[in-house]
Amino acid sequence: HDVGKAVNPLSIEGQIEGGVVMSMGYALTEKYPIDENCKPTAKYGMLGLFRANQIPPEIQAIVVEKPGLNVAGGAIGIGEITSIPTAPAIAEAYYQFTGEREFDLPLKNTPYAPKK
């Protein structure tokens, strides 16, 4: 991920990993039910958020510096950009594995799918 100048590399790695985990939850487990008035109908603990012991250890953050950018401190924000490609990549991998294209998230019939 291009960050311009890596001011705090450890923090950047944490942001990348956090964005990936957030998007994994969106793709695989998280459901945020609301009523017709947009009021949440589930308690926080029932939303399907990943717990720390459920996060795969294989997330590898690769920080790419691009010095000389004409921005404040030479740094570029990294927060949300890391979460954008993950859910579509997981959905495509699921399609390649099963041959079934799904159009709703979280994906169904996966080991992570919410239990009924």
PLM feature spans:
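C-terminal catalytic domains of large/alpha subunits in multi-subunit enzymes
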Residues: 1-116
